[in-house]
Amino acid sequence: MTTETFLVEIGTEELPPKALRSLAESFATHFTAELDNANITHGDVSWFAAPRRLAIKVANMAKSQADRIVEKRGPAIAQAFDAEGKPTKAAEGWARGNGITVDQAERLSTDKGEWLFYRAEVKGEAVNQLLAGMVSNALAKLPIPKLMRWGDKETHFVRPVHTVTLLLGDTLIDGEILGVQSARIIRGHRFMGEAEFTIDNADQYPEILYERGKVIADYENRKSIILHDARLAAEKLGGVADLSDSLVEEVTSLVEWPVVLTAKFEEKFLEVPAEALVYTMKGDQKYFPVYDKQGALLPHFIFVSNIESSDPQQIISGNEKVVRPRLADAEFFFKTDRKQRLEDNLPRLETVLFQKNLGSLRDKTDRIQALAGFIAEKMGADVNKATRAGLLSKCDLMTNMVFEFTDTQGVMGMHYARHDGEDEEVAVALKEQYQPRFAGDALPSNPVASAVAIAEKMDTLAGIFGIGQHPKGDKDPFALRRAALGVLRIIVEQDLPLDIEELTQEAARLYGDKLTNQNVVSDVVEFMLGRFRAWYQELGYSIDTIQAVLARRPTQPADFNARVKAVTYFRTLEEAAALAEANKRVSNILAKSADVKLNDKVLASVLKAPEEVQLAANLSVLQDKLAPLFAERKYQEALVELASLRDVVNNFFDKVMVMDKDEEIRVNRLTMLHELRELFLKVADISVLQ
């Protein structure tokens, strides 16, 4: 079978930088699926992505589909022919659909009967007749939230398309994609190299683009150049560059020919909190800040130019001129904001809505203040500090700095609180109230901050659920999933003695009569338990282990964590499988006898069979032994003790008829099984385990 290299390049206007990688990877994934579904053999599939192009290169692609055998089973012989042996309408219709007559059909015999059977070898089509359609199908499946039209065309894509190249070896594949006819024309860099040129063979890509067009189409290559050169540049400055992956990815998606340069700003700006300067450099300008070995910000930054200039100093000076006014603004805002105390902003919070049905930011502040104090008391943290931090929690939203540089909220609250002489734990709590902000983010670093962070999130959860605006599908405008997971992470990872049902009740109470959803507490608790399921699955715990624990509806997150770990360990014991099966059996028996009134306890005088006497004795001993373990949340030790029941339970079921005809004996045995099940349920519903 002859093979060729296949190339598709879609030349566009500037693609969304934050989506470039996902677009390219998705394009390659969907096109590979098209090839596999069409039974086209191929080698490695490589994707390329630059600001103005998406491309795929496929090695060793077969020039035609592989031949395949088509097999179709028809009606059973009994239904295929009538009593006179003539084909029925069902048989004739089936044969006609396959392009044959009934006489031409084969017979398929199995131990279940005999059927009409059709078998044919289908020759594969030439791939040059299929590729354009397959590319179009793959492009149609890209994750594009908003499509656009351009000119007078009816086609839609993420950005206007100017060139399309489809090459199989040196053969141009004819086809129209997104309204553009396939051609050999490829466009180069806007300002360097050749503006456009022709490509003769798919194997020339991407080298020809590098040599003639001055474009590095390989995304990972551009990224590695930026990382290498930026690290080297930072070392020459005696520092370390902040090369956060998200910003490096964005910059990689913005340039076709990366040239790393260094620039500086005036040292006086270092008097402004570093977070504000960094926000300007990273968020607005896409610059990489540089820190010294101790982590202090240096008056330098690294940026990536999209052009190789004969006078790089001119580019450096231009970028320094661009960033200076932004840094000067930050300096001005910082000085202006400190002319009044942070607390002086409280009245202005009354003028800003939190949510139209839930009051102002001042209302939210008052609720956070009260709830933080409530939580701090439960945690054993300083109540006065927690309420003080709650009172000041939203004041920085009214400052000039945060109004202009929104991502500095919390951080600026901390700096202004320190300037005002507030307690350090209070100041830090203002910054950390929003943590954790994303998966893997740091948790609040002190008990006061934890209390405020939990209060801030629980207030939002209770309020939004309280007016019936639950997250639906992918829509979660108030980031309730993130808030719920944040609360759970803080409580679990800091092992705090908090109950989410109790927290929700208090948070809802503080809203007074503003909430309309009467089920707000149960709704929030169920939502948070659902977050537990998703989180612990991501951590690698099995779904049935999680469900076994959730069946007990544990509302103390730290307790949930202890139970999941205990059940996970229990499953490693050799007794686990037998006891899980026994629990299923017990659960089924009790469910069928739900209307039976059980005894308050097992009656020793009614016990007859030696096996039930033994089980009752073991249960009695274990009940006394397990009580302190349950009280201290030593669930793993408790389950190890319960594992010792395996043989006794097995003997009981092997030798004893639970549903005895004597009612007194029957009820006593059901009571004993109920006590057995209740011991396991103190940890989890083991019967759920698969």
UniProtKB/Swiss-Prot annotation:
<keyword id="KW-0547">Nucleotide-binding</keyword>
<dbReference type="InterPro" id="IPR015944">
    <property type="entry name" value="Gly-tRNA-synth_bsu"/>
</dbReference>
<keyword id="KW-0648">Protein biosynthesis</keyword>
<keyword id="KW-0963">Cytoplasm</keyword>
<dbReference type="GO" id="GO:0004814">
    <property type="term" value="F:arginine-tRNA ligase activity"/>
</dbReference>
<protein>
    <recommendedName>
        <fullName>Glycine--tRNA ligase beta subunit</fullName>
        <ecNumber>6.1.1.14</ecNumber>
    </recommendedName>
</protein>
<dbReference type="InterPro" id="IPR006194">
    <property type="entry name" value="Gly-tRNA-synth_heterodimer"/>
</dbReference>
<keyword id="KW-0067">ATP-binding</keyword>
<dbReference type="GO" id="GO:0006420">
    <property type="term" value="P:arginyl-tRNA aminoacylation"/>
</dbReference>
<dbReference type="GO" id="GO:0006426">
    <property type="term" value="P:glycyl-tRNA aminoacylation"/>
</dbReference>
<dbReference type="GO" id="GO:0005829">
    <property type="term" value="C:cytosol"/>
</dbReference>
<dbReference type="InterPro" id="IPR008909">
    <property type="entry name" value="DALR_anticod-bd"/>
</dbReference>
<dbReference type="Pfam" id="PF02092">
    <property type="entry name" value="tRNA_synt_2f"/>
</dbReference>
<comment type="subunit">
    <text>Tetramer of two alpha and two beta subunits.</text>
</comment>
<dbReference type="Pfam" id="PF05746">
    <property type="entry name" value="DALR_1"/>
</dbReference>
<keyword id="KW-0030">Aminoacyl-tRNA synthetase</keyword>
<dbReference type="GO" id="GO:0005524">
    <property type="term" value="F:ATP binding"/>
</dbReference>
<keyword id="KW-0436">Ligase</keyword>
<comment type="similarity">
    <text>Belongs to the class-II aminoacyl-tRNA synthetase family.</text>
</comment>
<dbReference type="GO" id="GO:0004820">
    <property type="term" value="F:glycine-tRNA ligase activity"/>
</dbReference>
